[in-house]
């Protein structure tokens, strides 16, 4: 009996140093695990919020620079607002007061842009501080219709044809008049010769 108690006491004494160490480790590891889980949870929430914001931004402005291939031919990308704006009116010459503007320096012509309103308040404030309405540089050839160009080409060709026909007629008249003069002179010479021979025969 004493041997059993002694053995139990030895076992308890032998295991005693390890029990608090393991418990302290478990106590020390528990807050770290909770902190890690909390950080992972917060990062997941932040990622989800970023995705939602990007999704809303893309839905409000679906035609960004990366989606320029989706912009229709009658629309143009505006780098200021990040939106696809419609072209308004024709390409007009810049007035003297706007010659130094960025949209007039390149070609001296400008075309108005009609851009949709953004839901971003900061962006709206930025756009209001800039020129309103907005313009883009252009050249008169950008807005010329193909039909108008064809009509102008046909008119020029018709004018050249009329001029060439007139010149040709004048040249023909000159040649014909000189030919008629030569013909008349020959006829006169023939008449004179025939009259002279007739006079000789009568003699």
Swiss-Prot record:
Instruction: State the encoding gene.
Output: RXLR-C28
Motif RxLR located where? Answer: 37-40
- Which residue positions does the secretion signal occupy? 1-24
* GO cellular component terms, A-Z: extracellular region; host cell cytoplasm
Give its localization. Secreted; Host cytoplasm
Put simply, this protein is called Secreted RxLR effector protein RXLR-C28
Q: Which UniProt keywords apply?
A: Glycoprotein, Host cytoplasm, Secreted, Signal, Virulence
Question: Where mainly found?
Answer: secreted
The record's comment about this protein's domains reads: Has the canonical translocation RxLR motif, but lacks the canonical EER motif, which characterizes most oomycete effectors identified so far.
Please state which protein family the record places this protein in: Belongs to the RxLR effector family.
Q: What does this protein do?
A: Secreted effector that does not suppress pattern-triggered immunity (PTI) in plant host.
According to the record, glycans are attached at 32, 193
Tell what triggers its expression: Expression is up-regulated during the late plant infection stages.
């Amino acid at each position: 009996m004493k041997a059993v108690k002694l053995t139990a006491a030895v076992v308890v004494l032998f295991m005693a140093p390890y029990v608090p160490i393991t418990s302290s480790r478990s106590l020390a590891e528990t807050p770290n695990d909770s902190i890690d889980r909390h950080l992972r949870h917060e990062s997941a929430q932040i990622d989800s919020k970023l995705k939602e914001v990007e999704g809303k931004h893309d839905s409000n402005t679906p035609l960004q620079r990366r989606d320029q291939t989706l912009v229709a031919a009658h629309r143009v990308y505006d780098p200021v607002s990040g939106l696809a704006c419609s072209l308004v009116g024709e390409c007009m010459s810049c007035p003297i007061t706007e010659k130094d503007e960025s949209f007039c320096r390149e070609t001296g012509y400008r075309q108005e842009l009609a851009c949709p309103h953004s839901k971003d308040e900061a962006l709206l404030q930025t756009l209001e501080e800039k020129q309103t309405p907005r313009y883009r540089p252009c050249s008169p050839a950008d807005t010329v219709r193909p039909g108008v160009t064809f009509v102008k080409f046909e008119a020029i060709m018709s004018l050249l044809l009329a001029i060439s026909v007139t010149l040709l007629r004048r040249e023909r008249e000159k040649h014909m008049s000189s030919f008629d003069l030569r013909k008349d002179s020959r006829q006169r010479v023939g008449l004179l010769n025939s009259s002279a021979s007739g006079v000789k025969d009568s003699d």
